[in-house]
Amino acid sequence: MLNNKSILITGGTGSLGKELTKTILKKWPNVQRLVIYSRDEQKQYQMAQEFPESEYPAIRYFIGDVRDLERLKRAFNGIDYVIHAAAMKHVHIAEYNPDECVKTNIGGAENVIKACLSSNVTKVVALSTDKACAPINLYGATKLTSDKLFIAANNIKGKQDIKFSVVRYGNVMG
């Protein structure tokens, strides 16, 4: 499924991004390229110690923020599949910094969609949360909005060969 494909994970140094990286490298050892896209230089450095390019020649580390559309477009060059895992996910931090949460979780989603539509990406999976079902806080509301944007992108793609999907998870342990 992913062998000989180029995959990019936004939020690739986060808890879900790291686990996805482990899974992809284990199950699909012939992945053409796996791009870890995140804004945290220190986490990228640490992840590169765990997954060095010398042992994992397909892996690439790309500094960038989902709020920066032009940087996303550059990162998506030559990518087949995008897994969107970047988000502000801590409920109390989102409540204290609502503008940043909206910019990242909604604006970032819009930018990922725009960058995918302007490139040759064929599959997009946005990671969401159970908090998006009947949201009671800002985090849940922004993720519900993000989910709706990704699903609606299937209606604006025209004849472009791209599929947008959303998956929701519960609380992740471990």
Residue ranges and their predicted role:
Residues 29-43:
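Conserved glycine-rich Rossmann-like NAD(P)H-binding loop of the short-chain dehydrogenase/reductase
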Residues 42, 67, 89:
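Adenine-nucleotide cofactor-binding loop residues
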Residues 47-56:
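Short, conserved SAM-binding/catalytic segment
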Residues 60-81:
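Conserved Rossmann-fold cofactor-binding substructure of NAD(P)-dependent oxidoreductases
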